[in-house]
Amino acid sequence: MTVSILLDSLKDDGQRLSECRHESPFSILGPQPFKDKWIIRIWMPEASQVELVTQQTKIKLQNPNHEWIFEGVLEKDPGTDYQIKVNRGGIEHVQHDPWSFRKEWMGEIDRHLFAEGNHHHIWRKMGAHLTEIDKKKGVMFCLWAPHAKSVSVIGDLNSWDGRHHPMQKRLGGIWELFIPGLSEGDLYKYEIRTEKGHCYEKADPYGFQHEVRPAKSSVISKIDSFQWSDQSWISNRDNRDPLEQPISVYEMHLGSWMHASSDDPFINSNGEHRAPVPAADMKPGSRLLTYKELANKVIPYVKERGFTHIELMPISEHPFDGSWGYQVTGWYAPTSRFGSPDEFRAFVDSCHKEGIGIILDWVPGHFPKDQHGLAYFDGSHLYEHSDPRVGEHKEWGTLIFNYSRNEVRNFLVANLIFWFDQFHIDGIRVDAVASMLYKDYLRPEGEWIPNEDGGNENFEAVRFLQQANHVLFQHFPGALSIAEESTTWTGVTKPTDMDGLGFNLKWNMGWMHDMLDYFEIDPWFRQFNQNNITFSICYNFTENFMLALSHDEVVHGKSHLLHKMPGDDWQKYANTRALLAYMWTHPGKKTIFMGMEFGQRQEWNVWDDLQWDLLNYEPHKGIQKLVDDLNNLYKREPALWRNDFDEYGFQWIDCDDNKNSVISFMRREKTDGEWLVIVANFTPQNHSNYRIGVPVDGFYEEIFNTDASQYGGSNLGNMGGKSTDLYNIHGYENSIDLCLPPLSVLVLKHKSKKN
């Protein structure tokens, strides 16, 4: 029997639903108790007929109150055990009723933790989740948009029409809806209607996959289904102090390391052909490599070079190639430019199999204004500050996260944990930390607001960074958290319980600037700038420093490393070799940008390949061989890394010979351990009898020489090493008389006697 129950309010409800203004569809749709029976109401825009089908009966539903609200009466609550047969435009289909699945997805504890900013795994609730409810497969959508008037799921399932699938608003500004029948790979967005009536289409902030640019939709994607094989790697990583290990990082941008021809087959991990992703309009005829192809090419290359880690410039989804990945719109998704999330997982897994760690650039300092992203998300400044003096980087054209809002901090902190949990990464480098710490960063007077103490420190950002690092090391004690922080802010690498920011490494920007300034000087004038090459040791042990020659130093007219060097080609190569060797022997972990390892000549261009053809020339092969051997020497000699952050690990022999631009020092492992002697000559002048003091007599084997012929040098040296003489110099009774080749660095190792 069909009974129509006329409620005056239903006309208004139907009108609000049809205009996407209803925040509580569960209050009228689905099974509703009425006296001793149950009314089933179905919202079905543009349907001409709807039938309710159960195991026992089939009922033709009526629409007496609104043309798109169909209803009928059952004796008992059917729960979710019914289907609806819909006729729309003469086409019939059968589906389950989304509004029959009424149980809350986000429980009270989840909401509480999220509201206080402490739900470290919030991505397991937010976003689009393939799941099963009452044995019915589908997708649960969950979104935080507290100021929205209504939210709908739109996609191919409803022809991108927001009237079809309005979501239910829960406590805490959470919106939920389970849609049966959706599957992996389906596209979706959220249509958000604001209190002012404006309508925005937004990608899912917690989406696990997004379309390839320039498309902007989110993609339903599985998590937790990948079969990892790196359990031993993860266990070893989390049970040792990463700072007590050699760390040599190859920074790279996946989209410009190498391209393939558009004509080359483009095959996914299942062996299926698919459409190639063009590199860019600026590189016609080329396509991006896939994660699988990159694994096959990058991993053997990096392993042969001897690097311990790969640092990937941001791979979180981003719409504009020219941002290099630093303007993120898809925080919980690796970019689809190179393949699927599981294909990126396979890339990381393959790296771990070969003993290579993965560090990701993470950008919690700002986000772009793209309409489908976080900006003005629910009609309010939800993720950003409303005042541009606090909430906008005008020079970058980006917005700044409101770190004072618990849910925003939660979004970011959980995102950090997400990458370690879901993709097994080993570390992060946080970009542009100084822009977060200072309220007046890149701002003229009058365009920033002082803190409550009248200063320029951003206390909210400080607390966020402390929370992020504290939570990270709680969950992943062997992780790396690296700060790109360009100022003298104190305590960047101090633990949070000592009021530090909690990072365990900081890029040494001062060292980088001093080194490049020094090496760009004509060698004959370096004698007047000796402080540049020695000053870093004065503050080296105030933080845990990483020495970095990054992508930022080879763009925007700065030229690549080789071309920064003065002199003719021979001197350019020799200077490059000397700088790299000094970097590898100086205290601190190491990072260089792709191309530096073989002497790239052109500036880095995000749309182009590296100049691989240069490896057809001996000087470039020599630089590559030098980097290989530096990495192997570095890993083989604990004196070069074990005491990077302990003053005992470094001691000058002589840093005052500015006339000859020569420095000498020792790297020491431990009190009774081995040490190395390093001597650097930063002029083209050969010194055939250069004496330095050494602490112990014996034989000093020359174990590395940047002037070796295999590196492209002149092959001057010390015939394998030198024995000490009883000659007092530099405060030592014993000394060795060395041949210092031009523009060279020597590494010598003490032995009790010559073999």
From Swiss-Prot:
This protein's UniProt keywords: Carbohydrate metabolism, Glycogen biosynthesis, Glycogen metabolism, Glycosyltransferase, Transferase
GO terms of biological process kind: glycogen biosynthetic process
Entries under InterPro entries matching the protein: A-amylase/branching_C, Branching_enzy, GlgB, GlgB_N, GlgB_N_E_set_prok, Glyco_hydro_13_cat_dom, Glyco_hydro_13_N, Glyco_hydro_b
GO CC list: cytosol
Recorded metabolic or biological pathway in which this protein acts: Glycan biosynthesis; glycogen biosynthesis
Catalytic residue list: D431, E484
Enzyme Commission number, as recorded: 2.4.1.18
Coiled-coil residues: none
Family annotation (Gene3D superfamilies): Glycosidases, Golgi alpha-mannosidase II, Immunoglobulins
Reaction equations catalysed: Transfers a segment of a (1->4)-alpha-D-glucan chain to a primary hydroxy group in a similar glucan chain
Family the entry assigns: Belongs to the glycosyl hydrolase 13 family. GlgB subfamily.
Function field: Catalyzes the formation of the alpha-1,6-glucosidic linkages in glycogen by scission of a 1,4-alpha-linked oligosaccharide from growing alpha-1,4-glucan chains and the subsequent attachment of the oligosaccharide to the alpha-1,6 position.
HAMAP family: GlgB (MF_00685)
Name of the molecule in the record: 1,4-alpha-glucan branching enzyme GlgB
Annotated source species: Prochlorococcus marinus (strain NATL2A)
Upper lineage: Bacteria, Bacillati, Cyanobacteriota, Cyanophyceae, Synechococcales
